[in-house]
């Protein structure tokens, strides 16, 4: 079965027309710019392709989603989070979770080669497009820092009452999971219920994510896009889910 080739002004086909094999492949072509990306995410569609391939657009069924209420940190991660909360109360800033202070660096780290992977979908073109989206205030990074060194984090898209997770990395134990836990606290504080995880992995399932029928996912996205987005800003993200200026974190 063939998929449509998109020109710059071609609208996306309905997500329901995506192929079953490969699961979710919907269309190819078009442009990778913020307007196009915004239109895609609003319809439950995302780009995913390797360098040298055409621009490919996907909407898999089922869709992996982490409900914030279902976030399930391991016993060891819960201990780490409690320790970080105590350190925060004591004014210890050795380990911090920050928001939007190093978006491009987080993307570059997520694009790094990993075991078992021949390449990355986070190509220079993708990095440029999402950094432009970050400048417009809708792409965000959650970053784990130790002694002012970036050691882990994640990035994603905030549209209305929905957060679309993109990728994460860790150069220290649990560094990406700490960032995710603080993101969950922030989103919960601002009544954002779901994080889109796009595709199924055992790692995400271990943290509480589960596959949902695409139709259910699309209905939820359509319902919450009109909600106001959380009040993102550059700063330190605390365990309670509030963002403060680094000078005022105590």
From Swiss-Prot:
Swiss-Prot/TrEMBL GO biological process terms: protein catabolic process
Any one cellular-component term (Gene Ontology): cytoplasm
InterPro entries: Acyl_CoA_acyltransferase, Leu/Phe-tRNA_Trfase, Leu/Phe-tRNA_Trfase_C, Leu/Phe-tRNA_Trfase_N
GO MF, one example: leucyl-tRNA--protein transferase activity
One Pfam assignment: Leu_Phe_trans
EC nos: 2.3.2.6
Catalyzed reactions per annotation: N-terminal L-lysyl-[protein] + L-leucyl-tRNA(Leu) = N-terminal L-leucyl-L-lysyl-[protein] + tRNA(Leu) + H(+); N-terminal L-arginyl-[protein] + L-leucyl-tRNA(Leu) = N-terminal L-leucyl-L-arginyl-[protein] + tRNA(Leu) + H(+); L-phenylalanyl-tRNA(Phe) + an N-terminal L-alpha-aminoacyl-[protein] = an N-terminal L-phenylalanyl-L-alpha-aminoacyl-[protein] + tRNA(Phe)
Keywords, in A-Z order: Acyltransferase, Cytoplasm, Transferase
Stated family: Belongs to the L/F-transferase family.
Described function: Functions in the N-end rule pathway of protein degradation where it conjugates Leu, Phe and, less efficiently, Met from aminoacyl-tRNAs to the N-termini of proteins containing an N-terminal arginine or lysine.
The protein's name in its UniProt record: Leucyl/phenylalanyl-tRNA--protein transferase
